[in-house]
Every structure is written in C-alpha cells, then in structure tokens.
Amino acid sequence: MIRRAACLHLFAFCILGVNNMSDTLPQSILFCCDHNAVRSPMAEGIMKKLYGTEIYVQSAGVMNDLEIDGFAISVCEEIGVELSRHRTRSFDEMAQGGDHLSAFDLVVALSPASKQRALELTRFFHLEVEYWPIMDPTELGESREVKM
C-alpha cells in the first residue's frame, strides 16, 4: 500500500511537473535520488511510459550501492511500467558511460542529497535543476504485507 501510494505520488509529480513547465517539453530529463534504486528509476520508467521517445529520460543516484528495489518493480508493474531490467548507477558511472549532465535540459532531484550533488555537478552548465521532494518509501520499516 505504501509503495503503491509513493508510485502514484511520483506519477502525479511527473504529470504535473512536466505540464507546469513551458508549453514545450524538455528534450531530455535526468531524474536523480540517493541510490538510483527506487525513486529515480520509478520516475524514469513513468516518464518513458507517458512520453515514449518524445523525451530522452535517464536516472542516476548519488551513489550506486543498492540493486533496484523489488517493491518498486512490483508496484510499477501494476501500472504497466517495466523496471526489472533497470541497473542502478551513480552520477560518476553515468558520465563514464557517456551520459554527461551537460547533455540534459533538466535535472529533477528527488532527494536533498541528489539536489546538492546535481547543483555541484552542474554549476558550470546552463542547466535547470528542480527539486521534487519525494520521501524514500524504503525508510518506512513496515512489513512486506503492508507495503504491498
């Protein structure tokens, strides 16, 4: 239940956040959070479902120390978003793989730590960094039954 609520909350942010921008959609968006294991991959998957190939969408984390969260996979599957093939990566790994921050039109930070890191990494670029405060649902210590 909690993960489903978090997914729907993120879904609403994706719709409202993009629709509240100017009339033209950004060509590329990077979502970021702490570990790239729950919030940012969910946002990436939802945006790809909503906009297909209209917008280049990627995600990254401040660090890469976790695998994609199983509950995030399950909840997104319920709304037709595929996350099981997602591989977590950090900002540094993203750059090493050829996705440089300067190539994005918009960075959406979903946690305070990712906002700080995104601002540090983009201080020399003309790049917008937005902060959408999304609580990390994994920090809620509830049972599997309650989360599902």
Question: What does each model-identified segment do?
Answer:
Residues H9-L10, G45:
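A periodicity- and composition-biased signal for non-globular, repetitive helical segments
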Residues S22-M148:
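Short polar/charged helix/loop
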Residues H9, N19-N20:
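Intrinsic-disorder-associated, low-complexity terminal segments enriched in Asp/Asn/His/Tyr and depleted
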Residues I2-A6:
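Positively charged N-terminal leader segments that act as targeting/secretion signals
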